């Protein structure tokens, strides 16, 4: 009788030479990592007290260097020197008590009452051009 063909996974399990090479490669990588660990990660084994010992020593203050006058920062100019804030005018009397409505003082509404007649603009431009009425509507 004929045997069933081996699957890929079964064939890989039977490849002992390939498995041995993979095992050697893994062992070599592990030994290299073990040798390189102190160089890359050795600072993690340093005791905490030794690490903070350097921080406890206060650094010596740097000598202050006098800058020439042209490099010094000028003092801040107060805002009141270049911005003048005058008191607000009194709130005008209005019919509704709000700013923006028509004033209750009769003389202040003149500019609002100039165009009290409502005019229709429909056809005004056409009349200036002397168009016939059929073209307006």
From Swiss-Prot:
InterPro entries linked: C20orf85-like
Tissues of expression: Expressed in airway epithelial cells, renal tubular cells, pancreatic acinar cells and epithelial cells of the stomach, duodenum, and gallbladder (at protein level).
Record key words, sorted: Cell projection
One GO location term (cellular component): cilium
Subcellular location: Cell projection, Cilium
Keyword Repressor (UniProt): no
Sections of the chain in a coiled coil: none
Pfam families per UniProt: LLC1
Name the record gives this protein: Ciliary microtubule inner protein 1
């Amino acid at each position: 009788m004929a045997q069933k063909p081996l699957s890929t996974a079964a064939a890989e399990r039977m490849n002992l030479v390939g498995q041995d090479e993979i095992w050697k490669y893994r062992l070599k990588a592990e030994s290299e990592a073990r040798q390189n660990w102190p160089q890359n990660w050795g600072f993690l084994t340093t005791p905490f007290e030794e690490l903070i010992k350097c921080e406890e020593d206060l650094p010596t203050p740097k000598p202050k260097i006098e800058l020439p006058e042209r490099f010094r920062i000028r003092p801040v100019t107060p805002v009141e020197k270049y911005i003048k804030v005058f008191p607000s005018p009194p709130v005008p009397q209005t019919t509704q008590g709000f700013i923006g409505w028509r004033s209750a003082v009769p003389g202040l509404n003149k500019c609002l009452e100039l165009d009290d007649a409502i005019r229709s603009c429909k056809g005004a431009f056409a009349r200036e051009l002397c168009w016939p009425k059929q073209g307006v509507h």
